[in-house]
Amino acid sequence: MANTASAEKRNRQAQKRRARNVQVRTGVKSAVKKLREAIAKGDPATTQAALKSAEKTIGKAASKGVLHRNAASRKISRLAKAAAKPAAAAAK
């Protein structure tokens, strides 16, 4: 329990930030899930649209400080690689 007014305020602010960050993280997870589902279906157009959306969502999370920029970059890279795999297999 906070003993001072400033500690109470810090607690309120932390709760607001946490709620906001959880919402952003949930959006990232949802975008990644949609992309993985699109990859599983094998439709290139849907996959590209989902990849673009996921990249945008992850980039925004990194810019807001919810994700570290290197973690966001790594996640985008791995998702792009996974999205390109079925297209490369179909081209052979």
From Swiss-Prot:
One of its GO terms (molecular function) is structural constituent of ribosome. It comes from the Bacteria. One of its GO terms (biological process) is translation. The keyword Phosphoprotein does not apply. Residues 1-28 are annotated as: Disordered. Binds directly to 16S ribosomal RNA. It comes from Anaeromyxobacter dehalogenans (strain 2CP-C). HAMAP family: Ribosomal_bS20. Gene3D superfamilies: Ribosomal protein S20. InterPro entries: Ribosomal_bS20 (IPR002583), Ribosomal_bS20_sf (IPR036510). One of its GO terms (cellular component) is cytosol. This is Small ribosomal subunit protein bS20. Keywords: Ribonucleoprotein, Ribosomal protein, RNA-binding, rRNA-binding. Belongs to the bacterial ribosomal protein bS20 family. Pfam families: Ribosomal_S20p.
